[in-house]
């Protein structure tokens, strides 16, 4: 799903000397992201699995939902291994193929555990993370190839846009099917193990693509003659360790000076991404209180995926046609949009007779209503998901492009993986913090705080329900962290300007 201009831009990178077949390279870049998108097939079934099969409450379910992403955190380790440790004669190709096969294996294990009826949360936490860790390794290898070729040809932005276009297509279809499967699971027509088994199929595509399309020079590994260790060897090793410990602080300071943009990028990514998250808790509330069904979640999330796809294409077109708009301008606009639209976050917690509904509520004639069984809350979630999801795509794409432009090519795999892993760590951290805050606010000792909030003008819903009050408080917490990103955008902008680093959002040096 690329425009002819994007195709021409990618083709222009080919040269006889380099012998890079960009048609094959697109498969290498796109297949892992397509497969990552198909992983969304499990998103809704796992939500219901945590809530009803494992029987977890709000804070516990939120914590489990966050911790199942730990497998993505070791991306820097995978990046280092990919950069420095060849296997079967290759740095990238062999790891790419091996981990794709292991992803299949771990999803089969998840299917078997579900089939035998195991309900031990800790076991699933381990097996989910083993599966996600393999996706992370393939992702690292793919991104290392993308950064290496993209930086050389000035096409990082174009490659990033291409990858996430592919992911959006797969995600939209998979999450819809996930909702459909969960409905059938609740009707006892299908079973969760089937969803896990089907999720293990697409990684085979990645393995096949790696075997057929990754062109990599084979690494010749020198065979060193074995010799017996001696006391001199031991003493020399001890000296090296002490020397490393003595010089480590100076080496770290030198590394920090030479990679100053990356440190600013780390701060920016953390504060741009971080806001205490209650995703599972909110969805659980929507199931219990607002009557959301698996089909509704599937349609809403799928519509969000389609919106993501369309917005990626529009974003790619805009940044090519209007290159004069700087990356920081887009991000400041995203902050402003978040501030302006934050009152919309309250609507899911407002009763139908609340006066705020008068401003936006209207009835659709039955003959025009494609989803007659839906209530106002499901429709509201769908409309907001589509409209705001479309408008906020730069907030997602721009940090990826900046990371690709600033990482040191000497360790492209590890460096880019570290920045992306920081993004994943931030996602987990915000989920863990969200679970902790929700648990804290739920304690009897915090009743005074809740009573004060309930009696104040900040209680927009006018509710006395504890869960709703806490969810309202998180709306204000989210607004605070949105505003907190402003100084870090400016810090990063000044550092990139000082270093003379240009960020080409459209993937073209001439832009």
Question: Where does each model-flagged region fall?
Answer:
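Glycine-rich segments within core transmembrane alpha-helices of 12-TM secondary carriers
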Residues: 68-75, 157-179, 304, 420-431
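Helix-to-loop junctions at the C-terminal end of transmembrane segments
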Residues: 73-90, 182, 310-329, 438-439
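Intracellular juxtamembrane helix-capping segments at the cytosolic ends
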Residues: 137-151, 393-408, 414
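Intracellular loop-helix junctions on the cytosolic face of multi-pass helical membrane proteins
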Residues: 1-24, 114-126, 133, 137-142, ...
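A membrane-interface helix-boundary motif in multi-pass transporters
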Residues: 90-94, 180-201, 326-327, 438-482
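Transmembrane alpha-helices of Major Facilitator/SLC transporters
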Residues: 71-78, 297-321, 334-342, 427-430
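C-terminal transmembrane helical hairpin of 12-TM major facilitator-type secondary transporters
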Residues: 328-398
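Helix-loop boundary and gating motifs at the non-cytosolic
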Residues: 10-72, 261-290, 431
């Amino acid at each position: 799903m690329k425009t002819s201009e994007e195709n021409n831009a990618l083709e222009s990178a080919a040269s006889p000397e380099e012998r890079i077949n960009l048609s094959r390279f697109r498969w290498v870049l796109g297949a892992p992201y397509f497969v990552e998108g198909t992983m969304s097939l499990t998103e809704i079934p796992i939500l219901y699995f945590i809530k009803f099969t494992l029987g977890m409450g709000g804070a516990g379910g939120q914590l489990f939902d966050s911790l199942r992403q730990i497998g993505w955190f070791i991306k820097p380790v995978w990046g280092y291994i990919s950069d420095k440790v060849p296997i079967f004669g290759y740095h990238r190709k062999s790891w790419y193929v091996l981990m794709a096969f292991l992803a299949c294996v771990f999803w089969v294990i998840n299917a078997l555990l579900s089939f035998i009826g195991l309900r031990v949360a800790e076991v699933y936490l381990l097996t989910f993370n083993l599966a996600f860790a393999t996706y992370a390794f393939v992702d690292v290898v793919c991104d290392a190839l993308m950064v290496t070729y993209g930086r050389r040809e000035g096409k990082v932005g174009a490659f990033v846009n291409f990858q996430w276009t592919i992911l959006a297509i797969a995600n939209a279809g998979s999450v819809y099917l996930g909702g459909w499967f969960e409905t059938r699971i609740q009707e006892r027509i299908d079973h969760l193990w089937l969803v896990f088994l089907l999720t293990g199929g697409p990684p085979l595509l990645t393995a096949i693509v790696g075997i057929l399309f990754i062109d990599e020079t084979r690494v010749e590994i020198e065979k060193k003659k074995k010799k017996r260790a001696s006391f001199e060897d031991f003493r020399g090793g001890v000296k090296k360790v002490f020397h490393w410990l003595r010089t480590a602080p100076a080496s770290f300071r030198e590394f920090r000076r030479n990679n100053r943009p990356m440190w600013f990028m780390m701060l920016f990514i953390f504060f741009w991404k971080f806001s205490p998250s209650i995703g599972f808790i909110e969805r659980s509330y929507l199931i219990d209180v607002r009557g959301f069904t698996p089909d509704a979640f599937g349609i809403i999330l799928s519509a969000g995926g389609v919106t993501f796809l369309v917005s990626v294409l529009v974003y790619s077109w805009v940044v090519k046609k209007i290159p004069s708009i700087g990356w920081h301008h887009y991000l400041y606009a995203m902050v402003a949009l978040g501030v302006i639209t934050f009152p919309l976050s309250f609507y899911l917690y407002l009763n139908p007779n609340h006066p705020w509904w008068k401003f936006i509520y209207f009835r659709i004639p039955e003959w025009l209503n494609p989803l007659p069984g839906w209530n106002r809350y499901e429709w509201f979630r769908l409309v907001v998901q589509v409209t705001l999801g479309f408008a906020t795509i730069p907030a997602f794409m721009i940090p990826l492009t900046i990371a690709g432009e600033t990482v040191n090519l000497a360790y492209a795999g590890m460096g880019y993986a570290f920045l992306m892993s920081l993004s994943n760590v931030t996602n987990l951290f915000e989920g863990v913090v969200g679970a902790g805050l929700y648990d804290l606010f739920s304690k009897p000792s915090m009743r005074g705080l809740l009573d004060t909030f309930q009696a104040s003008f900040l209680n927009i819903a006018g509710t006395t329900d504890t869960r709703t009050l806490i969810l309202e408080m998180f709306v204000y917490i989210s607004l605070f962290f949105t505003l907190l990103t402003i100084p870090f955008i400016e810090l990063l902008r000044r550092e990139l300007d000082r270093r003379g680093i240009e960020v080409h959002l459209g993937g073209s040096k001439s832009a």
